[in-house]
């Protein structure tokens, strides 16, 4: 885990979007791999947990484990501030997630992941900050975010 993750924009293939929307969100969590832009899908299968590594819409590897704690070290969804959610929703953005990332030193850092649908599914991440509000602010100020916001969905 690096100290800073620059904002990135990635467009997922249609197959991956279809795969995500077909899943039961209550039992799964998703994150976009930083370097490889790999999508990790964590699923509970019976009494076991399965992590699938999906790259460009294709399953490239999978692992199973008996304990959720073995996967918990990756990314854990947290509750998103309502004011930020309302802002994104009013501007035509479909979803905002704040993800708590746990590094090797077990310190909690935050970054914002925005999912926008405007002809394609776009995932954008902010820089890593010490608090959720700082992460949101850093994303709002980024050139990448402003470029997407200027092309928001009409409503």
Model-found features: residue ranges?
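Terminal, regulation- and interaction-focused segments at domain boundaries
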Residues: 2-8
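Long, hydrophobic N-terminal alpha-helical segment
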Residues: 8-15
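N-terminal segment of the canonical double-stranded RNA-binding domain
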Residues: 16-28, 32, 37-129
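Ampiphathic alpha-helical segments that act as solvent-exposed interaction surfaces
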Residues: 119-155
């Amino acid at each position: 885990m690096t100290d800073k993750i620059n904002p990135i924009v990635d467009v997922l293939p249609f197959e991956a979007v279809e795969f995500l929307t077909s899943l039961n969100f209550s039992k799964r969590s998703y994150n976009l791999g930083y370097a490889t832009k790999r999508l990790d899908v964590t699923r509970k299968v019976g009494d076991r947990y399965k992590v699938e590594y999906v790259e460009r819409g294709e399953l490239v590897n999978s692992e199973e484990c008996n304990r959720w704690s073995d996967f918990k070290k990756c990314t854990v969804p947290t509750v998103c501030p309502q004011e930020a959610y309302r802002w994104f929703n009013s501007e035509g953005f479909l979803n905002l997630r704040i993800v708590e990332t746990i590094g090797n030193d077990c310190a909690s850092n935050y970054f914002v992941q925005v999912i926008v649908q405007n002809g394609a599914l776009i995932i954008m991440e902010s820089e890593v900050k010490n608090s959720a509000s700082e992460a949101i602010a850093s994303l709002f100020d980024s050139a990448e975010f402003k470029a997407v916001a200027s092309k928001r969905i009409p409503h």
